[in-house]
Design a protein with these regions (language model features):
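Glycine-rich phosphate-binding loop signature in dinucleotide/nucleotide-binding domains
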Residues: 1-6
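Short aromatic/hydrophobic "clamp" motif used to bind/position activated sugar donors
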Residues: 9
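Active-site acidic Asp-centered loop
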Residues: 12-13
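Conserved core of the sugar-phosphate nucleotidyltransferase
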Residues: 19-94, 98
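Left-handed beta-helix
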Residues: 94, 98, 102-185
Length: 185
């Protein structure tokens, strides 16, 4: 981070499948003046205890965060839905460095964003905002799957091979680019 001198750092979970353009999230982050922005979405409350569940105020500022709570809080006005973290975190670089160094000094910490860092900075009323991947207030639906279990991985794989997949890997407006370096055999 010191060498690159980037202003922002985007941290992504490796066990999720979704399609997202991060530019609107970065724009939201910059306009809100947030130190940290968390990608969020709503899911049925019965499934929410598998994720980090959060509460927001009217300005989308995160006011509470609990990692995998036994009794998740519903979204106000939507008693059967909960707001969860997608494992997408956008940090101002200096905030990330400060909080990771600070957390490293805490012996009882598990050094986990959802268990330790986010709850602490939210409790301290730092500038942490929620960026909705899909807006429950507008009944938007977008494809996002956690594939952290074998069953979830299988179900997501089956989603992709359906006749009309929710996430179309052949969408010409969303090309998949990769770089395969020329390596010796």
């Amino acid at each position: 981070l010191d060498r690159e001198r980037s202003r922002l750092v985007l941290i992504l979970a490796g066990d999720h499948i979704y399609k997202m353009d991060y530019r609107p999230m970065i724009e939201f982050h910059n306009q809100s003046g947030a130190e940290i922005t968390v990608g969020v979405m709503d899911i049925p409350i019965r499934q929410a205890s598998r994720f980090g569940v959060l509460e927001i105020n009217g300005d989308d500022r995160i006011v509470a965060f609990k990692e995998k709570p036994a009794d998740p809080q519903p979204i106000p006005g939507f008693p059967d839905r909960a707001l969860i973290s997608m494992g997408i975190y956008l940090f101002k670089t200096e905030s990330l460095v400060r909080e990771v160094i600070r957390d490293a000094k805490v012996e009882e910490s598990t050094h986990d964003f959802g268990r330790d860092i986010l709850p602490r900075v939210i409790q301290e009323k730092k500038s942490v905002f929620a960026y909705p991947f899909q807006d429950w207030r507008k009944n938007e639906k977008r494809y996002w799957r956690d594939v952290g279990t074998i069953q979830a991985y299988y179900e997501a794989s089956m989603d992709l091979v359906s006749v009309s997949p929710e996430l179309d890997l052949y969408d010409p407006t969303w090309p998949i680019r990769s770089y395969l370096p020329p390596l010796p055999p």
